[in-house]
Amino acid sequence: MSNRKYFGTDGIRGRVGNAPITPDFVLKLGWAAGKVLARHGSRKIIIGKDTRISGYMLESALEAGLAAAGLSASFTGPMPTPAVAYLTRTFRAEAGIVISASHNPFYDNGIKFFSIDGTKLPDDVEEAIEAEMEKEITCVDSAELGKASRIVDAAGRYIEFCKGTFPNELSLNGLKVVVDCANGATYHIAPNVLRELGATVIAIGCEPNGVNINEEVGATDVRALQARVLAEKADLGIALDGDGDRVIMVDHEGNKVDGDQIMYIIAREGLRQGQLRGGAVGTLMSNMGLELALKQLGIPFARAKVGDRYVLEKLQEKGWRIGAENSGHVILLDKTTTGDGIVAGLQVLAAMVRNHMSLHDLCSGMKMFPQILVNVRYTAGSGDPLENEAVKAVTADVEATLGNRGRVLLRKSGTEPLIRVMVEGEDEAQVTAFAHRIADAVKAV
């Protein structure tokens, strides 16, 4: 990955108006991608976006670049990231492109590619696109230029796909659900999916205006959802992020239910139904309570590096079907190819209905350990804090004290000069003190 100039672990992302998220760069990216993808045969590309105002500008730039390379673009309009992956597969398109910065504020945006089978583009294709970016743009002959069209029934197709992942013999009749769409790409999808399955739906975060995506709503800020669930005396709340690939839930008492708990519920239900193949994949940040709860059920558990890309890689390596991050990325490979907030939420609802249990009760088999995270800023030129002997000594001392009833994790942020210090254990006061003790050692470097 180190030789990449533009592609990160999750496509290309940045502040709108600053390189690389500028109209001229994105036009050239469209052209370069078009040149590479045209070698593979199909000349159709699916393009979706979330609700950011900059999406209009960037999809026009992509369209021009692709057309110059001789590829035609089919636009979905605002559409969740997993929906674009699904539509890319069903239309047999050469690739899908999503214009989104997921859970980031509106002033950021990004470009992410899906391959013909709805998974991330292979590394060699990304590298070939980067190589084309170094060349001058050339236009194909006029008769060969690409066209643009709109997929008018994209939302309806995806709504039916989501409903198809919910067991036919079950219904959501009698359930009152608050759904928070983060003023993002699921605003016209998620409420309809839930209503058509029989739920009484109260929708919030469903009034996008181009600049309010993820603003005090959605999976990264569930306070509005918690308040509304309690006010409406709802059975539960579902929060999606701006592009619909994350889900966080709220039980009828207003308690947050994160990605670890959601995976626990889905894995346990899969085991009960005899449908669980292998184990479950979490990340280095997954709560120790998840690991212990799965162990009690006899379900194998493996940790991947933080990032849904790495969860997917670990699933493929082990041949397992279910993985998640505590942030709410839940990957269910027996249902779809990528993290899908709506689909994951539906599997939890199915477990509630089938077992006649509340979300609160479904979570009760898993005891969450207190997990304290402290971010410490460091100066890039002052040496690597993770290699510092004093930091190592304090960390080893804390680990020895915790034994097998806790964990310590130190890692660098992928985007900022931060060291993330995470300490987990049974006693919140103790782990808080330990986390700050290690953080102080990092600061002293």
Curated annotation (Swiss-Prot):
One of its GO terms (molecular function) is magnesium ion binding. InterPro entries: A-D-PHexomutase_a/b/a-I, A-D-PHexomutase_a/b/a-I/II/III, A-D-PHexomutase_a/b/a-II, A-D-PHexomutase_a/b/a-III, A-D-PHexomutase_C, A-D-PHexomutase_C_sf, A-D-PHexomutase_CS, Alpha-D-phosphohexomutase_SF. It catalyses: alpha-D-glucosamine 1-phosphate = D-glucosamine 6-phosphate. One of its GO terms (biological process) is peptidoglycan biosynthetic process. Keywords: Isomerase, Magnesium, Metal-binding, Phosphoprotein. Its cofactor is Mg(2+). GO terms for cellular component: cytosol. The modification Phosphoserine is found at residue 102. Its EC number is 5.4.2.10. The keyword Electron transport does not apply. It is an enzyme of class 5 (isomerase). SUPFAM superfamilies: Phosphoglucomutase, C-terminal domain, Phosphoglucomutase, first 3 domains. Pfam families: PGM_PMM_I, PGM_PMM_II, PGM_PMM_III, PGM_PMM_IV. Activated by phosphorylation. The active site is at 102 (phosphoserine intermediate). Binds 1 Mg(2+) ion per subunit. Transmembrane segments: none annotated. Catalyzes the conversion of glucosamine-6-phosphate to glucosamine-1-phosphate. Belongs to the phosphohexose mutase family. This is Phosphoglucosamine mutase. The lineage of its organism: Bacteria, Pseudomonadati, Pseudomonadota, Gammaproteobacteria, Enterobacterales. The gene is glmM.
